[in-house]
Amino acid sequence: MPVFQSKTFRRATTASSSLGERIGETYRARLPKHPFLLFGFPFVMIIVAGSFALTPAAALRYERYDRKVQQLSQEEAMNLGLRGPDGEEGIKRNPRRRIIGDEREEYYRLMAKDLDNWEQKRVQRFKGEPDGKL
């Protein structure tokens, strides 16, 4: 007979040991024997359940964004430059508004410019603003 018994020692369950301690003890004892079943499988299930739970939240996010951002037709976009702050037409004109007929026309107009002969001009400063000259 060996000096030490092969049976592992397990302390007696007392009234002071709670249910959580007993469950944890059995979990730790069985984890080396079945690592995937007790650790990997619950982890994978939590990830899958989380993806199902977060799908409606992501859909809600994109639906709110779609309600906020609306696609304008080309005619509405052109009219944006002619409206005032309250929507009255003809009150203020946007100086940067240009009507571009066709992309090809714009391309050829830009290609016709002479980009080799240019002269650097200083921008006129406001009164009291330093001009940056030393």
From Swiss-Prot:
One of its GO terms (biological process) is mitochondrial cytochrome c oxidase assembly. The keyword Chaperone does not apply. It comes from the Eukaryota. It holds the Pfam family COX16. It is found in: Mitochondrion inner membrane. It is a single-pass membrane protein. The keyword Transit peptide applies. GO terms for cellular component: mitochondrial inner membrane. Keywords: Membrane, Mitochondrion, Mitochondrion inner membrane, Transit peptide, Transmembrane, Transmembrane helix. Residues 1-12 form a transit peptide. InterPro entries: Cyt_c_Oxase_assmbl_COX16. Its main location: mitochondrion. The chain crosses the membrane at residues 35-55. Belongs to the COX16 family. Required for the assembly of the mitochondrial respiratory chain complex IV (CIV), also known as cytochrome c oxidase. May participate in merging the COX1 and COX2 assembly lines. This is Cytochrome c oxidase assembly protein cox16, mitochondrial. It comes from Aspergillus oryzae (strain ATCC 42149 / RIB 40) (Yellow koji mold).
